[in-house]
Amino acid sequence: NFLHKLRDICTERGILLIFDEMWTGFRLSVGGAQEYFGVKADLACYSKAVANGMPLSILTGRKDVMKLLEHDVFFYTTFGGEALSLAAALATIHVLREKNVPAFLASQGDKLLHGYNEICEDFSITFTRCTGLGCRSMVQFDATGLVTALEMKTYVQQELLRYGILWTGFHNMCYSHTDKDIKNTLA
């Protein structure tokens, strides 16, 4: 209930609640964290996911707050009005809704997250675990006494790279990740 309580505090004190939806927008749900958690922000910003990687960012918000951008706030864009990215956004949102991509990301990501943790459990590995949400999870390491957590992460990255898996510590699922990709990663 953290976000709900935060919303209440911001409303009570006249503070704008701003969501950075760069990672959550169009991944947790088409409506981002606001839809997923049922909490409406006063302002929210989104990035390239809305346009499937094309250069586009979006600032959304309450009408009264957005009206301030017309006169009282200096606001500048790099690609403002660039039509290709806008067309990509429309097409992307259509596909996200039609194919329920956020649910697919959650399902595939859960397979990876739970698969990783099952391997750790099967081999009694206690110094690492996968946490987070299906669409974006992360592997955490504890120091083992022999090496630091960062060194352990580096060793794992090095070994995964030998098998053609580029991993930065996060799993950012995308619509093209198949069951075969997940099995290959967990192998």
Question: What do the predicted segments below correspond to?
Answer:
Residues 1-187:
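Conserved N-terminal phosphate-binding loop of PLP-dependent enzymes in the Aspartate aminotransferase
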